């Protein structure tokens, strides 16, 4: 069905008037350029949106490492998989395992900018229990994020604790989405680079769209991983936005 025949649905006179007016406007060079630009822009926008979704879905962001960096990653990954706590939690049927590949989200600090050799070396392994609202995260922090004395800035510890506490709050909120309303952190002792860290959190209470969580961070001894030192104690209050149900499609992590 052509444009003219389609417009006849509104009556003969309106159809003729609208179609003739459209033809006159299309003879204007500026109008033609506008239509062409609009078509090209719309096509590019649609293609970009579709490709972006494909990339996010298929995890095809490429990360290139040097030979030395690959050795570091493989060594840390092997040590991570052999940690006793990882093996124990993996065998515990109450816990589910979650691991988000690096560069899964362009808007994540720890999963993008701070990820890779010398930083957060490999993707942290996360275990969570929906029934008890407990979360464990095991991560390795490399030398490149350290200060002059090889200590880790408390801000990085606070960022990591905030994310682990947030995951814990997701387990108790209807739409599994929340934003940080308040975060309190104390550092009993210094944290150092080139160590594995265990971040733990549990739910204290929920009320409506609010969830209060508590967590701790432990630095494992490199010589004897069974020994650990508490480097952070945190309390976080998280609030689910009123429009949270409309944000599910933009959250890079889902908790099945």
UniProtKB/Swiss-Prot annotation:
GO molecular function: fatty acyl-CoA hydrolase activity
Gene3D superfamilies named in the record: Hotdog Thioesterase (3.10.129.10)
Transmembrane segments: 34-56
Keyword line: Membrane, Mitochondrion, Transmembrane, Transmembrane helix
Topological relation to the membrane, as annotated: Single-pass membrane protein
Coarse class of the protein's main subcellular location: mitochondrion
Cellular component terms per the entry's GO annotation: mitochondrial membrane; mitochondrion
Membrane listed as a keyword: yes
A Gene Ontology BP annotation from the UniProt entry: fatty acid metabolic process
Subcellular location, record wording: Mitochondrion membrane
Family membership noted in the UniProt record: Belongs to the UPF0644 family.
Name of the featured protein: UPF0644 protein PB2B4.06
Species for this entry: Schizosaccharomyces pombe (strain 972 / ATCC 24843) (Fission yeast)
């Amino acid at each position: 069905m052509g444009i003219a025949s389609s417009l006849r649905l509104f009556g003969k006179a309106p159809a003729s008037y609208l179609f003739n007016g459209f033809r006159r406007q299309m003879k204007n060079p500026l109008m033609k350029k506008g239509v062409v630009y609009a078509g090209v822009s719309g096509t590019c926008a649609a293609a970009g949106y579709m490709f972006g979704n494909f990339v996010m879905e298929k995890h095809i962001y490429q990360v290139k490492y040097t030979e030395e960096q690959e050795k570091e990653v493989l060594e840390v990954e092997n040590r991570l998989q052999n940690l006793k706590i990882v093996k124990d939690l993996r065998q515990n049927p109450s816990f589910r395992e979650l691991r988000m590949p690096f560069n899964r989200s362009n808007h994540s600090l720890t999963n993008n900018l701070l990820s890779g050799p010398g930083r957060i070396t490999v993707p942290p392994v996360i275990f969570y229990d929906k029934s008890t609202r407990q979360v464990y995260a095991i991560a390795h922090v490399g030398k490149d994020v350290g200060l002059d004395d090889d200590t880790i800035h408390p801000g990085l510890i606070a960022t990591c604790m905030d994310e682990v506490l947030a995951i814990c709050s997701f387990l108790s909120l209807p739409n599994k989405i929340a934003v940080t309303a308040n975060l309190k952190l104390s550092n009993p002792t210094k944290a150092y680079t080139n160590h594995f860290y265990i971040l733990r959190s549990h739910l204290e209470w929920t009320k409506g769209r609010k969830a209060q969580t508590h967590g701790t961070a432990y630095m494992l001894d490199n010589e004897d991983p069974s020994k650990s030192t508490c480097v952070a104690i945190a309390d976080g209050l998280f609030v689910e936005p009123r429009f949270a149900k409309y944000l599910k499609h933009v959250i890079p992590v889902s908790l099945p």
